[in-house]
């Protein structure tokens, strides 16, 4: 075994010694399994892979559920990208400066949200919208900055807020 290979193996061994040891996680070598029932954080969010749950250093991955007639909080993630895959249902996402743009996101759609871009998911449909959300922020909600709802979206104030993202 060459010097480079030995160095790589020793770095992996070192990393494995630092692997998370929480009792609610199963570890298999360098893999961590987070059972979805273990991560539920109220209505709307099943916490998955985060720095807290898996020791993730560069991403988080969660399942977001928005029941019919509900919305999220208008917010942005300071310095972190977001990628969303809609599994089922449909949402309208208000985004951009002043939340002036509206995009309908359907099951099977992917959506990319650049760092610092305000966004607001709304479910006006009749089924729960379910999406897988990945962010380049391993601390889950640490970088979330809530913004005011603009006047042109005042009708959304009557919709209950879902605890999410």
What are these regions (language model features)?
Residues 1-58, 73, 146-165:
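A short, N-terminal "cap"/entry segment at the start of jelly-roll beta-barrel domains
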Residues 54-58, 66-71, 88-92, 140:
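Short, charged/polar surface micro-motifs in flexible loops or helix N-caps
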Residues 61-64, 83, 112, 127-145:
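A short hydrophobic beta-strand segment most commonly corresponding to one strand
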Residues 63, 76, 87, 95-97, ...:
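Residue-level recognition of conserved beta-strand positions in structured domain cores
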Residues 66-69, 105-125, 134-136:
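Conserved metal-binding segment of the jelly-roll/cupin
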Residues 71, 80-107:
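A short beta-strand-loop-beta hairpin characteristic of the jelly-roll/cupin
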Residues 72-79, 117:
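Histidine-centered catalytic micro-motifs
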Residues 90-92, 118, 128:
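Structural motif
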